[in-house]
A protein has these predicted regions:
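Carbohydrate-associated surface elements
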Residues: 156, 176
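Aromatic "clamp/platform" in nucleotide-sugar-dependent glycosyltransferases that forms part
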Residues: 275
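Conserved donor-binding/catalytic core segment of Leloir-type glycosyltransferases
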Residues: 9-11, 186-203, 207-214, 225
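A conserved mid-protein helix/loop that constitutes part of the nucleotide-sugar donor-binding site
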Residues: 26, 30-33, 198-217, 231-237
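Short alpha-helical donor nucleotide-sugar binding micro-motif in glycosyltransferases
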Residues: 254-255, 262-267
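Nucleotide-activated donor-binding/catalytic signature segment of Leloir-type glycosyltransferases, i.e.
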Residues: 237-255
Length: 358
């Protein structure tokens, strides 16, 4: 029996397979690690539905992880995963003093987590991360969440969910950064423009390359780096070569999160032409690293310092050229939110529900 300490259960589609896996959902793993570090008296348990591809429980930075090895294998497999999650939680509820559940994404984790919370009379919140606020999310009607049960990662996501489903999340909690992950040593900004993210159509790295081609007309020696992997890689390599930019753009192989942060601290601009985002963690990280951020949207109603919101590719090009043309561009660090504050704000919701006073 482990009734001597409160237990906090997190339901998430995937989770790092080990402590060396820094590329799997960087923000959720930073949140979980910081939560456990901040509150050592709290027993944090993670239920990972689809990944890792294993069913063997393991420990990760002091957190117990139960993987259910769903592997995104289809409807029957998904139903079996849900049944196993339900069974595991039933056993856990008998042995632990469960304070609440946190579901990442308004999807299957929210469906099962909300069901379990209502069944056992526990507080639960679902954290909207991005794509789950768009039209066509069948889980919204299945979960039927109340506004008070929803946390949006940004003002944009709160507005998007309300526009599509007439539900406005009562809470907005943004992703924080961990200052300890950044080097304190001042570094020369030898990279003009950096792009960070999966190489998928949604991220629009074809536009990134087009912008670099435009910048090269003013700055022929412009230096750009793309960090990411994905199905668009070969097509993007072809585009780089066809544009004659092979000397200007480095398309790196898979890069660790620590290496990405180091590259950000050496970069002048994060260029993020994605067509849709919730709150890109790379925005917060790049701003803290001292880079300016240029993109097509703002996650919050009021842009942060050094964040430039543009409406077209032409405006994006002009803003980038303008920043690179300045002799004394300000590269001071901008803190959007610390990860410690993010964790505290989430736990405050459960505290308000009486989870930690019972």
């Amino acid at each position: 029996m482990e009734k001597d300490k409160k237990t906090f259960v997190i339901l998430i589609p995937g989770f790092p397979a080990n402590e060396q896996d820094g590329t799997c959902l960087p923000f959720p793993q930073l949140f979980v690690k910081t939560l456990q570090k901040q509150h050592p008296a709290l027993k944090v348990i993670v239920f990972a539905f689809q990944y890792p591809f294993s069913s063997v429980p393991y420990h990760w930075h002091g957190v117990t992880v139960y993987p259910f090895n769903g592997r995104e294998r289809g409807k029957l497999s998904r139903l079996f995963v849900w049944w196993r999650v339900n069974r595991k939680f039933r056993k856990m509820a008998r042995a632990h003093d469960v304070a609440g559940l946190l579901n990442f994404w308004l999807g299957e984790c929210s469906l099962i987590g909300t069901y379990l919370a209502r069944k056992y009379g526990l507080p639960a919140f679902t954290w909207l991360m991005g794509q789950d606020a768009r039209q066509g999310n069948r889980y919204v009607n299945r979960v039927k969440p109340t506004a008070g049960e929803l946390i949006a990662l940004s003002d944009f996501l709160a507005d998007e969910l309300h526009r599509n489903y007439r539900i406005r999340p009562a809470h907005v909690i943004v992703p924080g950064v961990d200052a300890a992950e950044f080097s304190m040593r001042k570094q020369a900004r030898t990279i003009d423009i950096i792009g960070v993210g999966s190489l998928i159509t949604l991220k629009r790295y074809d536009v990134f390359i087009e912008i670099i081609a435009g910048v090269a007309k003013t700055f022929p020696q412009v230096k750009a780096v793309i960090c990411g992997k994905g199905p668009e890689r070969d097509r993007l390599i072809d585009q780089i070569w066809n544009a004659g930019l092979q000397a200007n753009i480095d398309l790196l192989d898979e890069t660790t999160h620590a290496e990405v942060l180091c590259l950000m601290q050496r970069s002048k601009i994060l260029l993020h032409p994605s067509s849709y985002e919730g709150f890109p963690t790379v925005y917060a990280e790049a701003l803290y690293a001292g880079a300016h951020v240029v993109g097509f949207f703002s996650p919050m109603r009021h842009p942060f310092a050094h964040q430039h919101v543009v409406a077209s590719k032409e405006e994006m090009l002009n803003v980038v050229v303008n920043i690179l043309s300045r002799e004394n561009t300000d590269h001071a660090s901008v803190l959007t939110c610390s990860i410690e504050e993010t964790c505290s704000r989430v736990l405050a919701l459960y505290d308000s529900a009486g989870s930690f006073s019972k």
